[in-house]
Swiss-Prot record:
EC category name: ligase
Protein source organism: Cupriavidus necator (strain ATCC 17699 / DSM 428 / KCTC 22496 / NCIMB 10442 / H16 / Stanier 337)
Family of this protein: Belongs to the class-II aminoacyl-tRNA synthetase family.
Protein name as catalogued: Lysine--tRNA ligase
Keyword Lipoprotein recorded: no
Length: 514
């Protein structure tokens, strides 16, 4: 449930910022020590019967007269975010996992001893109450508290004023605080969960079986990326954190599971940027007797449904621009995309490898680098596309017909030499998905692996290894198959209007804290 951005939903002002935080912590530790002396400082016998958001929704139109005539008994707990002490009566705004609700606490109802203790409780404390719903004179739904308890003492003060965590890195580093004080952050991760649940549901509806494949690989494969390396002590062997599950999922296709998918983590020992995190979530799926055209239709439908399920609409706003996922996605070849956004390039120039190498140098591309060892015309066109068109693909666009030399696992085109039946989906200038008709010719796959090994020997750290067991699996025969990977984190960025991938990962990787 999305939390309202109301005044009461704002994080509370903690102790005055002029007071030293260490002094506040010391004072709270003294309070905790006193609680320990009294017996049970962290009681664990309270069981809520209601949550704040459900009460707000169910009784939003209920008048005070109705609540008096048919009392609603509730037991609710949460973190105290606001506190107003006024003599014999006080108010506290309490936040649970769903939202916020106000407690009305009077000395006559809870007793003099409990009320006196409450006045010394701090913002951030976890408290519980039993009582009845009522409306204040201002019409706010509240709990008339009859029983009040302190369940967990907060030792650290919440961020001051109404700004939450002002430092962006601190939001990532101390996500637990960010979640406490920011309803926007909580809504982002609820939307993430809704999107993933949507994907799972629609995959099941389409007859896919969810599976789990290894995270530790004896040979890294399934993508062009640099792996994290570890060591298995019991087996005394080097292992690699998986960069992609692809080759294991296709082994399952060989084994007879004709539709499989997996949502899990991949690990790539590469740079960190607003679009990249070394540990990230992907959904990969494979369907026998399909091809890349079927995959494009299916992927488009999946993403559209995920948007509707997570945000309620396929028409979104991303970074102050409209993003319409309801319309058919565009489909362009690499050269068509180049000429759409850089029309100065002629067909003849795009077919001239020498011209392209010279042109790429103007963009600062080192065409003598190891990854250009076997670079043909298609690779040079692809790099020019990345320099001129990729970032401008705001509307959902499938770029199709990738060159063989950069698509070692994709099926070659039957009609166009040097091209594979592969696509990448771009939205707002970011790659969201990558899919293709799978190469199921064991001998062709072995030849492509050998070429990848040549590139690795020449210094290309992202080139693939030769996976002999995968070749053996293909030799048993794999049916015609289509496979696709969708970047969950980047998809959630779109659905939540988040500019940085760290905004949609609960605990993103950061430099070590000094």
């Amino acid at each position: 449930m999305t939390e309202p951005n109301r005044a009461q939903a704002k994080p509370a002002a903690a102790d005055t910022p002029a007071v030293d935080e260490n002094k506040i912590i010391a004072e709270r530790r003294e309070k905790l020590a006193a609680l320990r002396q009294q017996g049970v400082p962290f009681p664990n016998d309270f069981r809520p019967t209601h949550q704040a958001a459900a009460l707000q929704a169910q009784y939003t139109e209920t008048e005070q007269a109705t609540l008096e005539a048919a009392p609603v008994e509730v037991a609710i707990a949460g973190r105290m975010m606001l506190k107003r002490v006024m003599g014999k009566a006080s108010f506290a705004t309490v936040q649970d996992g769903s939202g916020q609700i106000q407690f009305y606490i009077t000395r006559d109802k809870v007793g003099e001893e409990v009320y006196a203790a409450f006045k010394h409780w701090d913002l951030g404390d976890i408290i519980s109450a039993r009582g009845e719903l009522f409306r204040t004179n201002k019409g706010e739904l509240s709990v008339q508290v009859r029983e009040l308890r302190l369940l967990s003492k907060s030792l650290r003060p919440l961020p001051d004023k109404f700004h939450g965590l002002a430092d962006q890195e601190m939001k990532y580093r101390q996500r637990y605080v960010d979640l406490i004080v920011s309803p926007e952050t909580r809504n982002t991760f609820r939307a993430r969960t809704n999107a993933i649940s949507s994907l799972r549901r629609h995959m099941a509806d389409a007859g896919f079986m969810e599976v789990e494949t290894p995270m530790l690989h004896p040979i890294p494969g399934g993508a062009a990326a640099k792996p994290f390396i570890t060591h298995h002590n019991a087996l005394d062997m080097q292992m690699f954190m998986r960069i992609a599950p692809e080759l294991y999922l296709k082994r399952l296709i060989v084994g007879g599971f004709e539709r499989v998918f997996e949502i899990n983590r991949n690990f790539r020992n590469e740079g960190v940027s607003p679009r990249h995190n070394p540990e990230f979530t992907m959904m990969e799926f494979y369907a026998a007797y399909t091809d890349y055209r079927w995959l494009m239709d299916f992927t488009e439908d999946l993403i559209r449904k995920a948007a509707i399920d997570a945000r309620g609409s396929a028409v979104l706003t991303y970074q102050d621009r409209e993003l319409d996922l309801s319309k058919p996605f565009h489909r362009l070849t690499i050269c068509q995309a180049i000429q759409k956004f850089a029309p100065q390039y002629t067909d003849a120039q795009l077919a001239d490898a020498g011209f392209l190498r010279t042109e790429l140098k103007k963009f600062g591309v080192n065409t003598n680098a190891p990854q250009f060892l076997n670079a043909g015309l298609g690779t040079l066109q692809l790099v020019l596309f990345e320099e001129t068109a990729e970032n401008q693909l705001w509307e959902p666009t499938f770029i199709v017909d990738y060159p063989v030399e950069v698509s070692p696992l994709a099926r070659a085109s039957d009609t166009v030499p040097g091209i594979t039946e592969r696509f990448e989906l771009f939205i707002t200038g970011r790659e969201i998905a990558n899919g293709f008709s799978e190469l199921n010719d064991a001998e062709d796959q072995a030849d492509r692996f050998r070429k990848q090994v040549e590139q690795k020997d020449a210094g290309d750290e992202e080139a693939m290894y030769f996976d002999a067991d995968y070749i053996r699996a293909l030799e048993y025969g794999m049916p015609p198959t289509g496979g696709c990977g969708i970047g969950i984190d980047r998809l959630v960025m779109l659905l939540t209007d988040s500019p940085n991938i760290r905004d949609v990962i609960l605990f993103p990787h950061l430099r070590r804290e000094d």
